[in-house]
């Protein structure tokens, strides 16, 4: 199974390692090169520095045709943007966005994005540990709304930014991985967004 992960923070790196060890084809994108230090030296997937909210970067990285797309950065808005691109523009059917804010998680699920709410999962885990009934704060929400795929670029305004991709590690390489271009507003460079 081909799995694309945007965000190589603690969660993203752990998920990437787990699915790599299970023998899946794993591609990890992050805007910070240092984020890939979290991956073990045994990681056999592809690690690319690039902006997962940039459609051109996702395409050049090889995200099209993925079986699963996981947006796991620390930024709710970045995760939703990446998830929407994956579902609507790349046509990936199984897309999950990690969301920290439970109110946003429900709203995004209504827009057709499956959400994984860390806050809800934590409350559920504490309830379970203490033997309490569930507080009702959802940890995982399936999409209740609908998104439409848009594959016809000719019908949309052209974008002027070609994102940058750089191979930073991993067991495989990509011929597109060394392509680079200047991107205005390439995004946050703090670990909180990685």
Per-segment meaning from a language model:
Residues 1-194:
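Cytosolic regulatory regions of ion transport systems
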């Amino acid at each position: 199974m081909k799995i694309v992960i945007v965000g190589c923070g603690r969660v993203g790196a752990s998920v990437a390692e787990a699915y790599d060890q299970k023998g899946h084809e794993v591609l990890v994108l992050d805007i910070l090169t240092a984020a890939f230090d979290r991956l073990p030296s045994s990681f056999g997937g592809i690690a690319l520095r690039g902006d997962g909210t940039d459609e051109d970067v996702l395409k050049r990285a090889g995200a099209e045709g993925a079986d699963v797309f996981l947006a796991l950065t620390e930024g709710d808005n970045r995760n939703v943007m990446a998830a929407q691109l994956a579902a609507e523009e790349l046509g990936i059917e199984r897309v999950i966005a990690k969301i920290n804010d439970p109110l946003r998680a429900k709203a995004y699920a209504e827009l057709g994005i499956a959400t994984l709410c860390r806050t809800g999962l934590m409350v559920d885990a504490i309830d379970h540990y203490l033997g309490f009934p569930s507080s009702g704060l959802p940890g995982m929400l399936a999409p209740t709304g609908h998104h439409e795929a848009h594959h016809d670029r000719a019908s949309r305004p052209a974008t002027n930014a070609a994102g940058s991709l750089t191979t930073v590690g991993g067991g495989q390489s990509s011929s597109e991985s060394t392509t680079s271009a200047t991107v205005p507003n390439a995004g946050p460079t703090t670990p909180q967004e990685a």
